[in-house]
Amino acid sequence: MKKRAVTLLLCLVLVVLSLLRGFAASAAGITPATNADFDVPCAAAILIDEDSGTVLYEKNADARRPIASITKVMTLLLAFEALEAGKIHLDDFVPVSEHAYHMGGSQIWLEPGEQMTLDDMLKAICISSANDAAVAVAEYVGGSETAFAEMMNVRAYELGMTNTHFVNACGLDEAGHLSTARDVALMSREMLLHHTEVRDYCSIWMDTLRGGATQLVNTNKLLKSYRGITGLKTGTTGKAGVCISASAERDGLRLIAVVLGSASGKERFQAASTLLDYGFAHYESAAAALPGDAPQTLPVEHGTAATAPLNYESPGHCLMPKGEGGTLEAVVELPASLSAPVAAGEQVGRIKILHQGTEMCSYPITAAQNVDALSFRYCLRLLAQSLLLRN
């Protein structure tokens, strides 16, 4: 009875405390190499770990430059996001405008008024870097290429691409159309982390369109020469030079190498291979097991349930120097209790991954279900039930 009376009193007070703030996954203890350590044949470059975003190498990574057809990574990102939102569909027929028809550079020779499925358009962009297809998709998603370029800039801002400005959807040289190696890595990582289907398109070596009449050959020659390559996008223009954003995976370690402003295709692929080789030679993706005594629930104060079940995201993998992954330790950090309301999916703690006492990365612990705060209506119902039980 005392416990019920206290609960009823709390109902009247309706005290609601703030939940713990979330913890972001991160990697620590890694010092990136630079061109002072070793150089690659290009104007700017960066190598990052895809999972954590940790920079492993950089050279003039914040220098603003044209990026040629690597621009299409953002075009593809917006297209895949529209697909995910159900705004467009792979079997939609995308019309070709006069504007798209007049795109120069690499193309699949689309004709004004021609229609092609979005799926085929995406193949043309990913495999053959078709400018006409990129602009047609941009117009289909955004209404016009100009409007789509604004969408690209908004998305770039959201991703923290602070040194990027897009003017077109395909990457042809145009005044003010600029980015950096670091920003390219950011958008490449966003694409690869959240739209993994792009790997399926980018890993196709050869395909055909129009019933076999149009042949597509992948512009990323690393597909045939580098073990573990998964993408992503090449680019070449007079002002940008020869460029690539290359992604690769070996033994669970996923890397992204961005190379801008090489003098030739050979040097571009050489630079990307050198960066990826460096990453795979010096780092590994290591895991730590979750402690066996990790709590499965937490007490909840002022809630309609006494406890909240917990959802432990996998301790996953941490980026580690090569050969040092075997000493990782997972430590659970949780508060003594939570205060309602608790929302399913909210971060309530974290799994901290330690290496010799130093935190390397962390992963969230979330509430597995909602726990509402005590409400006046709930209290009245509880009071009524109490009175009925007494009778």
Regions found by a protein language model. Give the residues of each.
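A general, composition-driven signal for non-globular sequence regions
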Residues: 8, 12-15, 66, 109, ...
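Sec-dependent N-terminal signal peptides of Gram-positive bacterial secreted proteins and lipoproteins
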Residues: 4-26
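Residues in and immediately flanking transmembrane alpha helices
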Residues: 16, 85, 287-290
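Domain-terminus/edge residues, biased toward the C-terminal soluble/receptor-binding domains
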Residues: 161-165, 173-178, 182-391
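Active-site-adjacent loops and short helices of periplasmic peptidoglycan-processing enzymes
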Residues: 23-195
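Generic detector of short alpha-helix boundary/capping microenvironments
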Residues: 6, 10, 33, 40-41, ...
